[in-house]
């Protein structure tokens, strides 16, 4: 049961969902109009059936027409000719394309022809060859294991010879004696100027037990300063 309508009710109002009022007990319509009973859904097929005679005498093939196709520009050829002319920048190539025009040849039916497959002899056969059978005598005699051991021994001998040759060609490590021979004495830095009253002032702190211990420590420091980093030889050791 529909609610009463006021005003003129037109057929066009049934196509607008905002104006459609649902019937009591039914779902609301979406405003879709269906064609009449004489309308047939689907596409009409044209049957060109001439029987067996047409099927035997005619063979419909697709003909490729290239007359309506415009030839495309060959940018590869344009770039190649531009580079040959000495143009390398994008602006120069753009100007070259604007003043020159090279077109690609339109595709024809001959361009799609593929080479015929090679003719095969009727005696040719296609198969996968099987692995040759393993002789049972070699399995019983354990020859495969012996062969594997021999291959491993040959590989180890080659590896040892390579390592021995590499060790002989390696760099000889420097020792402390070689470093002392190559070292150069550090230049003595000039002493800073001091006031006359401070020239004969001794050290305020002496951490050695006696002058002999101090002398030994200074000699050891001077002998090891060659292999240490830094200007004064007080850094880490340079011998890796």
From Swiss-Prot:
GO terms for cellular component: cytoplasm; cytoskeleton; dendrite; external side of plasma membrane; membrane raft; motile cilium. It comes from the Eukaryota. InterPro entries: CFAP77 (IPR029147). Keywords: Cell projection, Cilium, Cytoplasm, Cytoskeleton, Flagellum. It is found in: Cytoplasm, Cytoskeleton, Cilium axoneme; Cytoplasm, Cytoskeleton, Flagellum axoneme. Coiled coil: none annotated. One of its GO terms (molecular function) is GTPase activator activity. Microtubule inner protein (MIP) part of the dynein-decorated doublet microtubules (DMTs) in cilia axoneme, which is required for motile cilia beating. Belongs to the CFAP77 family. PANTHER family: CILIA- AND FLAGELLA-ASSOCIATED PROTEIN 77 (PTHR28617:SF1). This is Cilia- and flagella-associated protein 77.
């Amino acid at each position: 049961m529909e609610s009463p309508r006021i005003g003129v009710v037109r057929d066009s109002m049934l196509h607008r969902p905002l104006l459609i009022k649902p019937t009591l007990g039914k779902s609301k319509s979406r405003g879709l109009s269906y064609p009449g009973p004489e309308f047939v859904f689907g596409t009409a097929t044209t049957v060109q059936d001439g029987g067996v005679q047409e099927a035997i005498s005619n063979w419909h093939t697709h003909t490729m027409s290239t007359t309506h196709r415009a030839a495309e520009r060959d940018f590869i050829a344009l770039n190649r000719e531009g580079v040959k002319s000495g143009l390398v920048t994008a602006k120069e190539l753009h100007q070259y394309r604007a003043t020159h025009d090279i077109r690609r040849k339109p595709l024809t039916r001959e361009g799609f022809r593929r080479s015929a497959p090679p003719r095969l002899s009727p005696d040719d056969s296609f198969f996968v060859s099987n692995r040759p059978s393993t002789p049972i005598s070699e399995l019983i005699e354990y020859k495969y294991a012996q062969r594997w051991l021999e291959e491993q021994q040959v590989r180890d001998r080659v590896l040892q010879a390579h390592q021995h040759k590499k060790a002989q060609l390696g760099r000889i490590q420097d020792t402390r004696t070689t470093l002392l021979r190559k070292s150069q004495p550090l230049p003595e830095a000039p002493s800073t100027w001091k006031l006359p009253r401070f020239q004969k002032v001794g050290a305020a702190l002496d951490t050695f037990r006696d002058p002999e211990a101090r002398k030994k420590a200074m000699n050891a420091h001077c002998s090891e300063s060659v292999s240490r980093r830094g200007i004064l030889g007080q850094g880490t050791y340079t011998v890796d």
